[in-house]
Amino acid sequence: MDIKLTESEVRVLGALIEKDITTPEYYPLSLNALVNACNQKSNRDPVMQLDEDAVRDALGGLQEQRMAGPARGADSRVTKYEQRLQEVFNFTRPEIAVLCVLLLRGPQTPGELRGRTERLHHFETLDDVQSALQKLMQRDPPLAKLLPRQPGTKESRYAHLFAGDVVEPEMPVHAATGVERNPKDAERIARLEEEVAELRREVVEVKDQLERFRRQFE
């Protein structure tokens, strides 16, 4: 099975998994609730601003790959949506918990995963987290990978492969050696970080538009 989701599809899928486990009383989700789940500021990296059209398009792409779709048997006049990963992959709860955090927050260390999966699944030890990661990496095709450890860091991170392979950029030397920043530069750096975040959101939108255009010819 060839998996290559857009960033919007990754976010929608992660949000559906999260709400399925943490707030089952409000699940499946209406389109409006799903938009809010995708755009919430907590437990999301990066924070995104998807509108209803973008989420609807992402749902269409996920439905084509049998990963999500309208809820079956829902007794409501409002269409609600659910994730269907169990039907495709038959994940264990530890696997789905780890995958959910990777989808919503990007690459993570085992320690970060243990802390951030607490509402999804309680891992007794880091070895339990590693076991879930190994199972994801041993799937065919692999659904996660171990990233090279960056200079100046103690732990390696793991990433999901639902959006294709992941290649981490080289870390600048000053970041690895811990050179102190000039306090006078803090405001300028904050502005630059805001601009980078905005550019990332624009790139996501453009990539999704290109992906939707490409799919018209498949």
Locate the predicted segments by residue.
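Eukaryotic, polar/proline-rich low-complexity intrinsically disordered regions
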Residues: 1-10, 22-25, 43, 54-57
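Positively charged, polyanion-binding regions of nucleic-acid-associated proteins
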Residues: 6-25, 90-107, 133, 138-139
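Residues in the recognition helix of alpha-helical DNA-binding motifs
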Residues: 15, 58, 132, 161
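Short acidic, hydrophobic short linear motifs in intrinsically disordered regions
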Residues: 23-49, 107-123
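A short, conserved structural fragment
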Residues: 56-59, 63-73, 133-150
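Helical coiled-coil/dimerization "stalks"
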Residues: 116-121, 147-162, 204-218
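Amphipathic alpha-helical oligomerization/assembly segments
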Residues: 179-216
